[in-house]
Swiss-Prot record:
Monomer. This is Methionyl-tRNA formyltransferase. Attaches a formyl group to the free amino group of methionyl-tRNA(fMet). The formyl group appears to play a dual role in the initiator identity of N-formylmethionyl-tRNA by promoting its recognition by IF2 and preventing the misappropriation of this tRNA by the elongation apparatus. Composed of an N- and a C-terminal domain. The N-terminal domain carries the tetrahydrofolate (THF)-binding site and the C-terminal domain is presumably involved in positioning the Met-tRNA substrate for the formylation reaction. It comes from Escherichia coli (strain K12). The gene is fmt.
């Protein structure tokens, strides 16, 4: 039975904590937890434990917080736990080859895409921005490459027209634990069927940046609408007005052709703020000026109508 496997869990954020919680709830034997060191957070920059550490300590599990797993003494921490398998979910540290080979069944990772599509740091956001019809999770055997290991199990889910990275994150945080528990059972039973990734289908999900989230009006309205959903809740798509950043929370596409230059404000009314793009019109519905809460376009127009005079251009 898979419950007899000795499991090391390595993860840091809430996404990882949900997987650890599922392992514990289903009776798995977690013999140690690795998570990143406490980090300063909040206005007071007080040291805060990761969600994984909080859960592990609540459950009385041994917690290890090395800055790196490269030093020999830190690798020894892993070796001494004599694990059958190490489960890695959004840990944030590189596992050296020596660590990958320590557990009897190796190390497995939960990745937030249908590999080999979207290897890398931001698979949820990139799948949304690209307009993919579906995404999912892949449980894979880890090797020294970046998300290059053999695939053990996949679960998929559709991407809807309303999904943001936040909602998709929640969907995958439900799927991931299901796939993980199934995979552990298959590893324990000897029924897992590793599948080599097709290198011809590989795409890369590069890390997001705040500058990348700046709205580029030369893109199509459809691309920008997906970008706004992909970058919500972080880093949030934004535009600049009078030197101030204004976040965009929600927009829609108006399928009407326009000859106006990209960035030109066409209309500003209770239906929204309509802006010309490289292809089509983007209707801004919910915005957030610096230092304010998110508000409807109508509410923003009531206080800042001078920002959105038809004929003016947003840059």
């Amino acid at each position: 039975m898979s419950e007899s496997l000795r499991i090391i869990f390595a993860g840091t954020p809430d996404f990882a904590a949900r997987h650890l919680d599922a392992l514990l709830s289903s009776g798995h034997n977690v013999v140690g937890v690795f998570t990143q060191p406490d980090r300063p957070a909040g206005r007071g920059k007080k040291l805060m434990p990761s969600p994984v550490k909080v859960l592990a300590e609540e459950k009385g599990l041994p917690v290890f917080q090395p800055v790196s797993l490269r030093p020999q003494e830190n690798q020894q921490l892993v070796a001494e736990l004599q694990a059958d398998v190490m489960v890695v979910v959004a840990y944030g540290l590189i596992l050296p080859k020596a660590v990958l080979e320590m557990p009897r069944l190796g190390c497995i990772n939960v990745h937030g895409s249908l590999l080999p599509r979207w290897r890398g740091a931001a698979p949820i956001q990139r799948s949304l921005w690209a307009g993919d019809a579906e995404t999912g999770v892949t449980i894979m055997q880890m090797d020294v490459g970046l998300d290059t290991g053999d695939m053990l199990y996949k679960l998929s889910c559709p991407i809807t027209a309303e999904d943001t990275s936040g909602t998709l994150y929640d969907k995958l945080a439900e799927l991931g634990p299901q796939g993980l528990i199934t995979t552990l059972k298959q590893l324990a039973d000897g029924t897992a069927k590793p599948e080599v990734q097709d290198e011809t289908l590989v795409t890369y999900a590069e890390k997001l940046s705040k500058e990348e989230a700046r709205i580029d009006w030369s893109l199509s309205a459809a691309q920008l609408e997906r970008c706004i959903r992909a970058f919500n809740p972080w880093p949030m798509s934004w535009l600049e007005i009078e030197g101030q950043p204004v976040k965009v929370w929600k927009a829609s596409v108006i399928d009407t052709a326009t000859n106006a230059a990209p960035g030109t404000i066409l209309e500003a009314n209770k239906q929204g703020i309509q802006v010309a793009t490289g292809d089509g019109i983007l209707n801004l519905l919910s915005l957030q000026p610096a230092g304010k809460k998110a508000m409807s376009a109508q509410d923003l127009l009531n206080s800042r109508r001078e920002w959105f005079v038809p004929g003016n251009r947003l840059v």
